[in-house]
Amino acid sequence: MRFKGLDLNLLVVLDALMTERNLTAAARSINLSQPAMSAAVARLRTNFRDDLFAMAGREFIPTPRAEGLAPAVRDALLQIQLSIVSWEPFNPAQSDRRFRIVLSDYVTLVFFEKVVARAAQEAPGISFDCLPLADDFEELLRRGDIDFLIMPELFMSMHPHAALFEDKFVCVGCRTNEQLSEPFTFERYMSMGHVAVKFGNTRRPTIEEWYLLEHGLKRRIEVVVQGFSMIPPMLSGTERIGTMPLRLAQHFAKTIPLRIVELPLPIPPLAEAVQWPALHNSDPASLWMRELLLQEASLMVSPRAPVRLSAPGF
């Protein structure tokens, strides 16, 4: 099919190459043979009068011209998919939709497991692909490669989003850690060894670390882990402490001997929100899933302040 001299099928080829950066993988993703894919690349280069891709080993490296074309091509294909190809009434009871959702281990344990349980009742054919927090979430949203992103609202981009729930940060340590006795001061917090969380390949710090860095302060980090759920096991039998959301600390305190105390830092509450690609704003399946997320979030009880909290039996 041609539109003003351009074979529109070539746009699908260009999008696949931008995604896969490999000729064989791109051909497989759109069900073309490798010779047909090579011929399509040649036609793309002729049409746009640019090489579009340079070879580096087996990887296709896009030229500036290809980089400039890619966002418009992806947006056009998504609009066609959502507005024409996929547009139909959404029946959750009969749907086999698979949602791709980026979220943290914390959100999974304190919130999303309830969402999955409810979805199993209302939409048994629906499935979920839960992905770890990524450094390129803005690109994933722009390209429509994910359906939802759940993370602190503070870090969200300009795509549409909605607030889910709030939590507060607390300090945790082993039940036998006497340094967590009251009053637990800021000076003591800074003097102790910490188990800290850093996310993604770029090792992005958490909110409390941002607060300390902005005030020119540096704590003694002795262990770095990839998620909040890894903090409690690293504290057992040590004098180290960790900073994590209260809901998750209470979750682990049921099975791990933890002591939970107020965090001596004036940091704001942790406000979790859900974000989705702007192009999915009117997608019936996305609308249904958003409503389910918001309903489950509204059922969450606000966490109580840990005046002197610990595991049972302390």
From Swiss-Prot:
Keywords: Activator, DNA-binding, Nodulation, Repressor, Transcription, Transcription regulation. The keyword Repressor applies. Belongs to the LysR transcriptional regulatory family. Residues 23-42 bind DNA. Transmembrane segments: none annotated. This is Nodulation protein D 2. Residues 6-63 form the HTH lysR-type domain. The keyword Magnesium does not apply. Gene3D superfamilies: Periplasmic binding protein-like II, Winged helix-like DNA-binding domain superfamily/Winged helix DNA-binding domain. It comes from Rhizobium tropici.
